[in-house]
A protein has these predicted regions:
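Tubular lipid-binding modules of the TULIP superfamily
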Residues: 1-113, 142-216
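Extended lipid/amphipathic-ligand handling interfaces
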Residues: 85, 128-139
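Amphipathic hydrophobic-ligand
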Residues: 114-131
Length: 216
C-alpha cells in the first residue's frame, strides 16, 4: 500500500525534525521556560516571564518563587527505550522529557527591627517525563498547525506517593500551559510544491508524525 493510502497526499516530520523545531521555538522564546516572581524576576522580558507571588496570610508580599524548565525533547512511537512505570508509550503517542527547577524564596527569620528577614532561594531540580499525543488545528489549504496534548506526567524518584501525586499534578499543569504555545505549522511538515488540505491525522508511527489529505 502506498504512503498516501486512499488520500492524494502524505506529509510527515520525523523525531529529529520535531526536536529541531522545539529547539528553534524555545531558543527564540526562552521566556516560555523561565518564570518567577520578585525578587527572582523583576519584569517581563524576552528571557523571563514575571508572575505574581503566592499570597498567604502572615507572609508580607507573598511567597516568592521561580520555575525554570529545560527545552523538552521528544521520543516518537515506537519508543527508543522503556519508560519508568507506570508510563507506557503506545501508538500515536510521544514522550517528552525536561528538567524542572523549582525555587522558593525562604524568609530567613526577622531582622532586629522586627521587619521581614532576607529572602534566601531554596531550589530543587526534578526530572520530568510526560506522555502525550499530537492534535491538529486546520484553517485552510496549507494553513494550520500540529500541537501537543499531554496524557500523563511523571516526576521521577519522588516519595512518598502523596508528594508524587502533588508534583505530578503541578508539573502537568505547568507543562500543558507551556506546550499550549507550541505550534508546528503545516509548512514545516508538508513540502513546498503543494498545500495540504488536511483529511486525516496527525498520527505517530515509525518515529514520525504523519498527516494525510488532498492537495491544493
Amino acid at each position: 500500500m502506498s504512503l498516501t493510502g486512499t488520500h492524494h497526499a502524505f506529509a510527515s516530520i520525523d523525531e529529529r525534525g520535531v526536536n529541531r523545531a522545539l529547539q528553534a521555538f524555545f531558543g527564540a522564546r526562552p521566556h516560555y521556560l523561565h518564570y518567577g516572581s520578585v525578587p527572582f524576576v523583576t519584569s517581563d522580558s524576552t528571557t523571563e516571564t514575571l508572575v505574581q507571588t503566592i499570597a498567604f496570610p502572615g507572609v508580607p508580599g507573598g511567597i516568592a518563587y521561580a520555575i525554570d524548565l529545560t527545552i523538552p525533547t521528544t521520543d516518537l512511537y515506537p519508543p527508543d527505550g522503556a519508560l519508568p512505570p507506570p508510563l507506557v508509550l503506545g501508538p500515536d503517542q510521544l514522550s517528552l522529557t525536561t528538567e524542572a527547577t523549582i525555587t522558593i524564596g525562604c524568609t530567613a527569620g526577622q531582622s532586629a527591627d522586627g521587619k521581614r528577614g532576607q529572602v534566601m532561594p531554596v531550589s530543587t531540580s526534578l526530572d520530568v517525563i510526560a506522555i502525550g499525543h499530537p492534535v491538529s488545528v486546520y484553517f485552510s489549504p496549507g494553513v494550520g498547525y500540529v500541537r501537543f496534548q499531554l496524557d500523563q506526567v511523571l516526576v521521577e524518584n519522588v516519595a512518598p506517593p502523596s508528594l508524587q501525586a502533588v508534583l505530578d499534578c503541578l508539573l502537568e499543569m505547568i507543562l500543558s500551559a507551556v506546550l499550549s504555545s507550541v505550534e508546528l505549522p503545516f509548512n514545516i511538515i508538508d513540502v513546498d510544491f503543494f498545500k495540504l488540505i488536511l483529511e486525516a491525522g496527525p498520527t505517530i508511527a515509525d518515529n514520525q508524525i504523519e498527516i494525510w489529505g488532498d492537495v491544493s
